[in-house]
């Protein structure tokens, strides 16, 4: 079961003090400037999923409308989020699962100071799937699959700052897996509701501004029918 926020925050701070980084000198744009970070190996139990991740945002929103709010700190709810992540790209997930099991995590993620995953939900889900089913994989994989390598942000950040970072790394750079149209519409709407301009949204999502306008109009039409 995932730990609470204070426990996670204390553990991540201790990791940065006591452990050697896996990578150094990683530059990311955070809070209006380019900052340099290191990445660390973090035990999976000290992380929680970002339930409104662009890849599964509509599934989570639909579930919460029909049933109840999902709490990533709750084991059953975390399992539901994992299921959404798995089903979102099942074929590709199977292929990546085999790769991670044999070779380990290749790309670092990004997490908040209390362990919320900003970039890397899917990779963390696959690592959790491997560690929760150890008999299916060679024992040589067990050690490296118990940890998620990630940058740990240096401050909590505002909701808007985290949304900006999340969007850039999930939808502006993530060419590994395409997002479905509805996820893009919803992300545009969320950014607009958080006072991002159309120009800012286009840059974050690596799309031309007329496309952003089209998606926002589509989302508005969809909302009018609900």
Indicate where each model-derived feature is located.
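Short, charged/polar connector segments at secondary-structure boundaries
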Residues: 2-139
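Amphipathic, charge-rich alpha-helical segments that serve as recognition/docking helices
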Residues: 84-85, 132, 141-224
């Amino acid at each position: 079961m995932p730990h609470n926020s204070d426990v996670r925050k204390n553990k991540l701070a201790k990791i940065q003090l006591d452990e050697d980084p896996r990578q150094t000198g990683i530059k990311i744009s955070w809070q209006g400037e380019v900052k340099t970070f290191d990445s660390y190996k973090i035990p999976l139990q000290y992380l929680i999923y970002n339930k409104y991740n662009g890849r599964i945002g509509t599934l989570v929103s639909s579930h919460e409308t029909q049933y109840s709010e999902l709490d990533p700190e709750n084991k059953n709810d975390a399992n539901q989020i994992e299921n959404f992540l798995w089903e979102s790209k099942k074929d590709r997930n199977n292929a990546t699962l085999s790769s991670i099991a044999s070779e380990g995590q290749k790309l670092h993620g990004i997490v908040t100071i209390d362990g919320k995953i900003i970039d890397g939900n899917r990779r963390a889900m696959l690592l959790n799937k491997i560690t929760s089913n150890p008999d299916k994989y060679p024992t040589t994989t067990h050690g490296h699959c118990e940890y998620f390598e990630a940058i740990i942000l240096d401050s909590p950040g505002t909701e808007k700052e985290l949304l900006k970072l999340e969007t850039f790394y999930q939808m502006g750079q993530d060419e590994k897996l395409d997002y479905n149209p509805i996820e893009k519409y919803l992300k545009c709407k969320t950014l607009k509701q958080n006072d991002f301009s159309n120009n800012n949204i286009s840059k974050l999502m690596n799309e031309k501004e007329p496309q952003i306008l089209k998606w926002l109009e589509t989302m508005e039409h969809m909302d009018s029918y609900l």
